[in-house]
């Protein structure tokens, strides 16, 4: 016994297959873009030390100002790239009062997530998770934080400055 399908069903199936192929090709392209972007980023910022150095340079490019007493005098803090106000003794890390404040993942991974979100069109948190080998919900949470920052829901000029410098160095490679 043979089952005959109406010709409209075959046309719909062909349209579905065509749409599915386009979606898969776009997904492969995004995965390739994400992979290339991640490799380029790792050449510029390979470890936490270089990420903290870049963050501190961008954060205090106009000089240190204590967030507690507004003093501009400081000395080196306990941890690397932190500063201690000589007036009130408050220690401020490079990540304090930035989008990277209280970030539970390494700072270089957090910067890489921000870089991927800003430079790869429509990248999913699943793809970021796969690229960086970090839990999906961690990537989702930080991706959401970056997107809120980009939408103007928080006043983070620092993120834009950091990403512009990284983009400039990546383009030189």
Q: Can you say where each PLM-predicted feature lies in the sequence?
A:
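Residue-level recognition of single "structural anchor" positions
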Residues: 13-173
């Amino acid at each position: 016994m043979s089952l005959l399908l109406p010709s409209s069903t075959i046309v719909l199936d062909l349209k579905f297959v065509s749409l599915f192929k386009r979606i898969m090709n776009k997904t492969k392209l995004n995965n390739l873009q994400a992979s290339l972007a991640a490799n380029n980023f790792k050449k510029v910022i390979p470890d936490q030390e270089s990420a903290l150095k870049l963050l501190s340079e961008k954060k205090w490019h106009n000089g240190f100002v204590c967030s507690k007493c507004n003093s501009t005098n400081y000395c080196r803090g306990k941890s690397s790239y932190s500063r201690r106000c000589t007036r009130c003794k408050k220690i401020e890390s490079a990540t304090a009062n930035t989008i990277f404040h209280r970030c539970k993942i390494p700072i270089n991974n957090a910067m890489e997530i921000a870089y991927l979100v800003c430079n790869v069109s429509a990248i999913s948190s699943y793809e970021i998770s796969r690229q960086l080998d970090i839990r999906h919900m961690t990537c989702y949470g930080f991706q959401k934080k970056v997107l809120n920052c980009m939408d103007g829901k928080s006043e983070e000029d620092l993120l834009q400055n950091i990403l512009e410098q990284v983009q400039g160095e990546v383009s030189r490679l």
